[in-house]
């Protein structure tokens, strides 16, 4: 993808700017009102551009709205490609493939899991702060052994 070819990376950034601004300013489709272009990846041969998008405020939970937005993007694909070609000045304009970006939704799930884990850690820390050993500190050490150890040190010093 765009990682190995610097020209592909520049074209991907250009496509992202053009598609995002066109969705916002030129396409007057209500289905695309909350669409955000998150990333564009262009193949090294500059033939295909995958445009990753997400919906603001929905995190992918509204399946019906997501499908309607995908339909609107697919319908506007030709118009957006011609706008990209016009603004980029490329001889061959890459084909646009719109892919829903799952990363933001997954990131929210991971954040929720981490918040639960942090809350459990805090509860355990509170319990540990007031916890005491169930018995003696060392149940195998007896008083007579402690005295014998003390006597050994006294006899060595003499």
UniProtKB/Swiss-Prot annotation:
Any one GO CC term of the record = cytosol
- Keyword presence, Nucleus: no
- Residue ranges of region Disordered? 130-158
Q: Where is the composition biased (Acidic residues)?
A: 145-158
Protein name (record): Ribosome-binding factor A
Q: Does the keyword Cytoplasm apply?
A: yes
Source lineage: Bacteria, Bacillati, Actinomycetota, Actinomycetes, Bifidobacteriales
Please name the GO terms of the biological process aspect recorded for this protein, alphabetically: maturation of SSU-rRNA
Question: What keywords tag this UniProt record?
Answer: Cytoplasm, Ribosome biogenesis
**In which family does this protein belong, per the annotation?**
Belongs to the RbfA family.
Compartments where located: Cytoplasm
């Amino acid at each position: 993808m765009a990682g190995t070819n610097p020209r592909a990376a520049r074209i991907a950034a250009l496509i992202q700017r053009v598609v995002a601004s066109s969705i916002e300013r030129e396409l007057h489709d209500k289905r695309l009102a909350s669409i955000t272009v998150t990333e564009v990846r262009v193949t090294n041969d500059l033939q295909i551009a995958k445009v990753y998008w997400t919906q603001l405020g929905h995190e992918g939970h509204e399946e019906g709205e997501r499908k309607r937005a995908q339909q609107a993007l697919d319908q506007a694909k030709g118009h957006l490609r011609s706008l990209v070609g016009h603004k980029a000045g490329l001889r061959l304009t890459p084909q646009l493939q719109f892919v829903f970006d799952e990363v933001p939704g997954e990131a929210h799930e991971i954040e929720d899991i981490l918040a639960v884990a942090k809350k459990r850690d805090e509860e355990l820390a509170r319990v540990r702060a007031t916890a005491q050993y169930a018995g003696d500190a060392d149940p195998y050490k007896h008083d007579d052994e402690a005295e014998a150890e003390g006597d050994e040190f006294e006899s060595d010093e003499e």
